[in-house]
């Protein structure tokens, strides 16, 4: 999934900028970004909810609230693995639905920054050889400045 594909889902670049920042906060804690995959998608009654998915893959993510340390949001993304990405269809077409437990998580246009974070990581971030994390860059600058003698 390209960043352009992600922009078409988020409708705004703000959520994508936030996605990299949320990702950086989460890997800072234990060095990994954890996403759960539902193994029993055949047990889901998706058609009763108006969802037509050929080969469903349900993903769940967890993101800590930036504003309240005791609040964790759950993100659910439904992907149709049967969608073949080619010249006519891109990665966006394989995303059948998404939801987040945050106050803005059930948007009808675009998605919240939490959903954008998981989509960014799954579709783009994890395929990069290196992800520039703003905080690491700032930490290195502070270390370099701290090592210099003051006059």
Identify the role of each PLM range:
Residues 1-151:
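Long, low-complexity, compositionally biased intrinsically disordered regions
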């Amino acid at each position: 999934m390209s960043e352009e594909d992600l922009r078409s889902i988020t409708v705004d670049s703000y959520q994508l900028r936030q996605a990299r920042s949320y990702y950086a906060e989460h890997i800072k804690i234990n060095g990994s970004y954890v996403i759960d995959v539902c193994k029993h998608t055949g047990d889901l009654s998706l058609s009763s909810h108006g969802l037509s998915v050929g080969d469903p893959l349900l993903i769940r993510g967890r993101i800590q609230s930036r504003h309240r340390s005791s609040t964790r949001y759950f993100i659910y993304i439904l992907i149709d693995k049967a969608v073949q990405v080619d010249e006519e269809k891109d990665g966006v077409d394989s995303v059948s639905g998404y939801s987040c437990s945050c106050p803005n998580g059930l948007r009808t246009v675009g998605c919240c920054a939490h959903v954008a974070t998981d989509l960014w990581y799954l579709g783009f971030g994890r395929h990069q050889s290196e992800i520039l994390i703003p905080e690491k860059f700032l930490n290195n600058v502070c270390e370099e400045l701290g090592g210099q003698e003051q006059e």
